[in-house]
Amino acid sequence: MDQIHRKYELPHTSRRREEFEWSIHYAFNAGDRTLPRVLLVGDSICNGYHAQVRERLLGIANVTFWASSKCVTDPDYLRELEFILEEYPLDLIHFNNGLHSLTTDRAEWEAALRNTFRMILDKLPGIRLMWCASTPLTDPELTAQAVELNAIGARVAAEFNLPADDLFSVMNPLDRKEFWCDKYHFTPAAKELQGEAITQALKPFLNTTGNADPEAFRRGT
């Protein structure tokens, strides 16, 4: 098994791990090879919306998701991601990292994100990769930090000509009391909105016959 992730690890990171770190990984319809497979990568927000995306992609694509508390600067992040990339054939990756990185050194996070994209594209040549912005929070100061990371993420994604799913803009106009259940997380109604927005972002890159549409991906539409 190739250990490509070692080539892309940062030589140093100043970020310390959180008191509790966690990782959740599910592959649905694992034995089915008749439909393309979408990998959703994110954190607890991804853990919240994956079921809504999976429901909407029924009959179009199978879904794997990996939700983790780790920042892309964590030495083990790429190791875990590489294992998931190897597990099943993938057609499209919807990628987010950010809410557990709000206080991470910006230069380190940018370098690690860039290396993460490089590793994915090196590991899976021709894979369709989409950047997803982090969602806003109820705390304005934390939201401002998310905006900073989203701007960096969008710039790095543009370097690779990756399409972007601006989930931040979908959620930011909404009422914090109605659609948030705590500082970070969302109500069932908000998860439905996220699931619909993500599905609409993914669908142009998947056709209804179960084959990814490379021309749509190239256009970024």
Where are these regions (language model features)?
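Serine-esterase "nucleophile elbow" of acetyl-processing enzymes
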Residues: 1-75, 79-89
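Alpha-helical cap/lid subdomain in secreted, periplasmic
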Residues: 56-62, 76-221
